[in-house]
Amino acid sequence: MKFVSTFEITKGFDRWLHLVDVELKEKLEKYGVKVHFACANDDETRVYDMSEIDDQSLVEAFMADEEVIKLRTEAGVNLSSAEVLSTVDKFKIW
């Protein structure tokens, strides 16, 4: 399942990128999550991303994983602001 989501961040986009590229790498692999695209607004307080999870039944487990929660919070993600904007069937990245 591919989806577009958004959430608030408080420590900037580079800090969030480090979270995804380094700190969450093992957890993303464990739960089959891939981030295909991400961008931030001008003041780097909100991220918009397109991600994919291999097994939709693992979404809740990933979001409830205590280490994932801890790492995301430490990286400045406002967990309560997360919103799935839409699922995605087709896409192209140039």
Language-model segments: which ranges?
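Short S/T/G/P-rich N-terminal loop/turn motif that feeds into the first structured element of a domain
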Residues: 1-69, 75-94
